[in-house]
Amino acid sequence: MLSTTAFAALALQCAASVHPDTAHEVARVESGFNPYAIAEIIPKVERKPGDKGVVSYFPKTKEAALQIVNQIESRNHRYSVGLMQITSTNFANFNTTAEKMFDPCENLKVSEQILVDCYKRGGDILRGLSCYYSGNPETGTKPESDFNNTSYIQRIGFNPPDNKKNWVVPSVKDAIRKENVTQSIKPKEGANKRGNSSRLTQSFHFFMFEPIFSLVNALNQPI
């Protein structure tokens, strides 16, 4: 498992166009900073009542990780690997392999391309992260029973607005966040607001990279 300091240095080197805050939170949720983390995707037809759709593995060595990958491939299941959990169906898109994706820097390089593509297609950080997770801008915002009824963006750190109490005078912090987010996440010219890029179904397009919007500035915005 990589330390926070080690990951930050690696992210700056290998995924320079993604803000370190964003890379950090995605890695935390996706792999817990374990470069050998694996998630096996169980087809619905094979699940029994109560079964989860994903089985997670956290081997301690690359050799053990490759053995697990071989077992998963023998079952013809899809899977995702490494720090940023690159999905097996995307290996061909980026001319890579599971073994290469267990290299932290190589994994970050691929995730950078996907995150940039998703962010530019989605037009803002929420839709971009949903795209990275699921292949569309909406699924990542919906609660999932496999994850204690939390959504992907909640697990990343975004919280839905608290509507339980109707304050006469609202929070100044909420107003500041809303103003900052409004100014920061306006879609760039030419961005496709209804993007459909993903680790699973991405049709990748090359373009000049620009730094992705900082996650810290967007946390807790109303969704």
Give residue ranges: language-model regions:
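Catalytic glycan-binding domains that act on GlcNAc-containing polysaccharides
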Residues: 2-164
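N-terminal secretory targeting signals
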Residues: 1-20, 154, 158-223
